[in-house]
C-alpha cells in the first residue's frame, strides 16, 4: 500500500515492511497466510507486496516464492491447499483438489513475481477457463477462508468469483500490454 501511495524504496516504513516479509519467508520459499488458506494465499500476498515495493523479480526471495508455487501446482493445472496445513506440528504444505480461489491466488502471485510467461501460469489460466460455469463464475466445495485456524474455517462465497476474475484480467492485461510487471493494484 505504501508503494501505491508513492513511498520510495528508501522510505523507512517501506523498508521495514520488506524486511519483515523477507524474514518471515519459510525455508521452502512459501509464506504463511492468514485470511485465506494458507501458504498459497500467504505466498501470493508476500509476492504482491514485494513487487509493489519495487523488488526485482530476480530477487532470491521472489524467485524462491515463485518456485514454491510452481512446485505445488496440481497435475490438473490448478492449485489447492487443505486447511490441515494450519496444524500445530507443521510438516509442510498440505495438497488438496484445485479450487478457483487458490488457483487465482497462485496465478496472482506468479504474475507479481514476473512469471506471466511461465507454462505453469498458462496451465492455471487454462484450468480456470475449463472450470468456469455457464454463468461465467466458479463454484468450490472446499473452505478457503482462514477463519480461526484449527478452530473453524470460512466459506467466503465471493472468493471463487472475485479472485479468478481478477487473475484472468491481470493475465490478459499483462499479455497484451507493454509491461510484464504488475505495476498497479498489486
Functional labels for PLM-detected ranges:
Residues 1-19, 23-179, 184-186:
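An alpha-helical repeat/solenoid feature that recognizes helix-turn-helix modules
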